[in-house]
Amino acid sequence: MKPIKIALIGAGNVGNSFLYAAMNQGLASEYGIIDINPDFADGNAFDFEDASASLPFPISVSRYEYKDLKDADFIVITAGRPQKPGETRLELVADNIRIIREIALKVKESGFSGISIIVANPVDIITRAYRDASGFSDQKVIGSGTVLDTARLQFAIAKRAKVSPNSVQAYVMGEHGDSSFVAYSNIKIAGEYFCAYSKLTGIDSSNYEKELEYPVSRRAYEIINRKRATFYGIGAAIAKIVSNIIKDTKNIMIAGANLRGEYGFHGVNIGVPVVLGANGIEKIIEISLNDKEKEKFAKSVAIIDKIYQDAIKNI
């Protein structure tokens, strides 16, 4: 297998957490960092190089220019800016769309032909804007979507059932935001639906829907209130996406994918189960949703699309 090259655009906490996770898993032999502040990119590259001395395999980390992206296999984009005091969400979204469009054009001009993973928020909207501006295929433009929300859900279910999170099949779908929802009708442990598994094993399944909502909907706020930001969890989740693609696992994970008729919608990037393999998103999986879940999915699509269309008018 040829050596893997991964480029990071945006050397903030999330980007650096991803790169550190990827390094320790041995996902690539070469890493490059692009940041609006070249000194910051250099400083992080130096720090990561020092860390690499303790790894059991050789890697290189350096500051990249956009021209260096031509033969990269992956680009992970976390670049964007936070909300300013007094600024509306729409103004922030419009400005971050402008930023991602500029990045997309520079990436395309470099000759890059690999897989782009977008993590910048609001991720569903920014991923769509990047895809539209770059013209890259749906397979090769992947949003982080609700991957972290899903990881939190699986952890909460596993803790309740006293099993490994790897034994839990559960998805948070829709927007990476307030309109996301848990697909309760699809929760399984060891192949058994949650309620059936509960009866088999004697675990308490009363009020489980209400109790599982908390770690999904409030966990990020709990972290932000205590340490101002979340980054290790999403960094590890993105490394997992990259790992599955590199290893061509064909595993099913949640990711932000562009819908082309799946679930009855077109043109919206949203968190859904996908098959990950060497080509990126190899298939979108349409799981069965009950009527309540279908309504929530449609509401989430409508919210994402409206914000995107309104932001475009504001540019």
UniProtKB/Swiss-Prot annotation:
This is L-lactate dehydrogenase. The keyword Heme does not apply. Substrate binds at Q83, R89, N121, P122, V123, D124, D149, T150, A151, R152, T230. It comes from the Bacteria. GO terms for molecular function: L-lactate dehydrogenase activity. Keywords: Cytoplasm, NAD, Oxidoreductase, Phosphoprotein. The active site is at H176 (proton acceptor). Disulfide bonds: none annotated. The lineage of its organism: Bacteria, Bacillati, Mycoplasmatota, Mycoplasmoidales, Metamycoplasmataceae. The modification Phosphotyrosine is found at Y221. Catalyzes the conversion of lactate to pyruvate. It comes from Mesomycoplasma hyopneumoniae (strain 232). One of its GO terms (biological process) is glycolytic process. GO terms for cellular component: cytoplasm. Homotetramer. The gene is ldh.
